[in-house]
């Protein structure tokens, strides 16, 4: 499914899990991959990547989030598969208006949330 449909994937978890998962996903794709730096703008129109790896999306500035939403909404732009990563859960940021809900749902067609039990916000709440 990941090869034919190429859904956007949001990977949440510790650095080792994220790196391993991204490596596995990249290995499954036969085309070129672009690794963007943190808080990077969307690629220019001449990028021929089949996959974009967008790290640490939880740290995208509000302006950068708007740029990504505009880019993803532009029907005239070819959109590669996006693998976005975060070491912290992004949905709480959406609920507190610190992260665009539109962007969140565009980036996580598939959500791989692999926080350990010790990292989970629910567990931390119970321990208080």
Give the positions of each predicted feature.
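A short helix-turn-beta junction within AAA+ P-loop NTPase domains corresponding to the substrate/partner-engaging
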Residues: 97-119
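AAA+ ATPase active-site-proximal loops
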Residues: 1-93, 114-127
């Amino acid at each position: 499914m990941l090869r034919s449909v190429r859904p956007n994937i949001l990977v949440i978890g510790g650095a080792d899990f994220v790196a391993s998962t991204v490596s596995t996903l990249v290995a499954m794709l036969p085309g070129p991959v672009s690794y963007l730096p943190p808080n990077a703008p969307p690629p220019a129109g001449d990028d021929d990547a089949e996959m974009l790896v967008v790290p640490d999306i939880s740290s995208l500035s509000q302006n950068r989030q708007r740029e990504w939403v505009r880019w993803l909404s532009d029907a005239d732009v070819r959109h590669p598969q996006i693998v976005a990563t975060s070491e912290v859960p992004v949905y709480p940021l959406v609920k507190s208006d610190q992260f665009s809900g539109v962007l969140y749902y565009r980036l996580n067609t598939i959500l791989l949330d692999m926080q350990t039990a010790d990292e989970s916000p629910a567990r931390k709440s119970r321990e208080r």
